[in-house]
Structure formats: C-alpha cells, structure tokens
Amino acid sequence: MPADQRPLAIALMGPTASGKTALALEAAERWNGEIVSVDSALVYRGLEIGAAKPDAAMRAAVPHHLLDLRDPWQVYSAAEFAGDARQAIAQIVARGKLPILAGGTGLYFRALLEGLSHLPEADRAARASIAAEAEQIGWAGLHSELARVDPVAAARIHATDPQRIQRALEVYRISGRPISYWQALPPGLRLPVRVLKVVLAPRERAVLHGRIERRLDAMLAQGFLAEVEQVRALPQMRAVAVPLDLPAVRAVGYRQAWEYLDGAGSLAEFRDKAIQATRQLAKRQLTWLRGELDARWFDPELDRHQLERALVGFLGDRSAVRQASGV
C-alpha cells in the first residue's frame, strides 16, 4: 500500500502534565476520533487520580482504549501493549475513525511505531533474583553491574529507573547477551498507518514545573492518598512480598505515596518527593522526545495557532463537515 494511501493517525506525545489529554479530546471531537492511551500507568485498574486517568465523562464523550487492562499486582509489557494497540487501531480505522495515540510512555510509543527487537520473554525467577539483590545492594549497585556487562544499555538507563535496570539484567542473565545486542537487531512489523507525531512541551521549564506542582496538589485534594490506601488494602497486594517492585507501584507519585503511607517522612516531605520525582520523569521524557527527529514541537499555550495549522494540514478541516452532518 503506498504511503499516501495508508490510514492517518496522530500521536500526541510530551512530558507529563503538558496538556496531551485535553488536546486528544479536542482532536477526537473535531476529527471524529478515538483515543488510544500510550501510558504505562493507565493500564492498571485502581490507578485513577494519581495516574490522571480520563474520568467517566471523558470516556463517555470519546471512546478510549487500553485503559484498565491489568490489576495492580500484575505486569504488562511493551510487547503486549504494541499488540493490543495495533488491534485497537485496526478496529478504529475499520470504523472510519481517526486513531489518536496519546501519552508519555516512550517505550510504548517505540514498540508501536518502530517495532521491538526480538527480546527474550520475561523470566519470573530471574526477576525475583534481581529484586532480591536490589534489597541487598540497591538499584544503584545493580546499575553498576549493568555498566560492567552492558555499558551501552547502562548509558541509556538512569540509575533511578529500577524497572529498566531489572529488565536489562534479566535479558543478559537468561540469554547471555546484553539487551543492547537484542535492541540493535532489525525491528519487527511496523504500524501500517501514516502518523503525525506532535510533541506538546512548554518552552520554559518553569511553566512545566508549575503545571506539575498544581496537578499534584489537585490530585491530593481529590483523594489521591485514599486511593493508594485502597490499592494497598487489596488482598492480592498484601500478599506481594515487595510491592514496591511492582510496575504499578513504581509509577511516579504512587511510589512516593506508598513510602509515605509506610511511615517514611511527613506529608510535606512526601509532596516534595513526588514533585521532584515527577520533574525527573518529565526530564527523561523530554530527553527521549528529542530523539524523535520527525516529530513537530509545540508549546501548548503559545503555539495554539501553529498547532491547529499542523493538524489541519495533515488531517484536513473536518469541522464544517461534522457540524453539517450533526455527528
């Protein structure tokens, strides 16, 4: 199929708290779209307030996909996401609608848009062994080990990113080859749609930091800590030996809330830690996004007109058609 005949889709990317959800809803209403979440926290049931999951009104107004796929004690891989997202996109296109990929999880975007190398499957025993070692020497110590066996991967993975450290060491231990070897292999099947990549990011870092702080305060006012208490109280979560090793609990904000509810520090200290962790996440997201050379960057507040022109230029101006048809 020629490239210009492929179905269209848009990818709304950006750091946390940059306005992706609002733009996705606007685009879905204007261009008759459905939203495919590209967020590793939103796949977990029970993670609502702290994950900024679309509420019932949003989901009633616009169909959303890939939310609430797993319980918080379960694991969901990038490969599983890519398969589920590909299926959702095919169904959206079959309905004659626009797929809108919205989120900030770079690994998910990479898996879907570029394909994943043929990495070895997850190994529970290896993961458990690595988690036990982390209890003894810490993730920084394991990052040092990774630097010895796979310096290429260690240079890409931050010492405070336990999930990726664990996966890189797991791959090395079960296959005998570093994860960077597997990632350098030709990727799998690419997504058969033509995608416009849009990055939303305030030009001034202070603006993003302010949005992060205000959003956390709003989450606390909405009952974020009570939500985490509910997740902690689930029998399946109470049965987990080291819940802080679960991907759902490692989500930014949830980890800091979990530690606070375990008695680590005051409420003010929890707030400061959560804000700092979210800023660090945003920094990592921006670093990854700068590698997306075919993406177009817009300030969500200052570049509204340029952003609209870019979307209309790619998708066409369907607003008049939709208004006339009553859709």
Curated annotation (Swiss-Prot):
Site Interaction with substrate tRNA: give positions: T105, R127
UniProtKB keywords: ATP-binding, Magnesium, Nucleotide-binding, Transferase, tRNA processing
According to the UniProt entry, what is the EC number of this protein?
Answer: 2.5.1.75
Positions of the UniProt region annotated as Interaction with substrate tRNA: 39-42, 163-167
Q: Does the keyword Nucleotide-binding apply?
A: yes
Under the heading InterPro entries, the entry gives: Dimethylallyltransferase (IPR039657), IPT (IPR018022), P-loop_NTPase (IPR027417)
Q: Where does ATP bind?
A: G14, P15, T16, A17, S18, G19, K20, T21
Q: Report the catalytic activity.
A: adenosine(37) in tRNA + dimethylallyl diphosphate = N(6)-dimethylallyladenosine(37) in tRNA + diphosphate
| Binding residue positions for substrate | T16, A17, S18, G19, K20, T21
The Gene Ontology biological process terms listed for this entry are: tRNA modification
Required co-factors: Mg(2+)
Enzyme class, first EC level, given as a word? transferase
Residue ranges of coiled coil: none
Q: Which Gene3D superfamilies match?
A: 1.10.20.140, P-loop containing nucleotide triphosphate hydrolases
GO molecular-function terms, A-Z: ATP binding; tRNA dimethylallyltransferase activity
Q: Which PANTHER family match?
A: TRNA DIMETHYLALLYLTRANSFERASE
Give the family from UniProt.
Belongs to the IPP transferase family.
What is the protein's known function?
Answer: Catalyzes the transfer of a dimethylallyl group onto the adenine at position 37 in tRNAs that read codons beginning with uridine, leading to the formation of N6-(dimethylallyl)adenosine (i(6)A).
Give the quaternary structure: Monomer.
Q: Under which name does UniProt file this protein?
A: tRNA dimethylallyltransferase
Tell me what organism the protein belongs to.
Xanthomonas oryzae pv. oryzae (strain MAFF 311018)
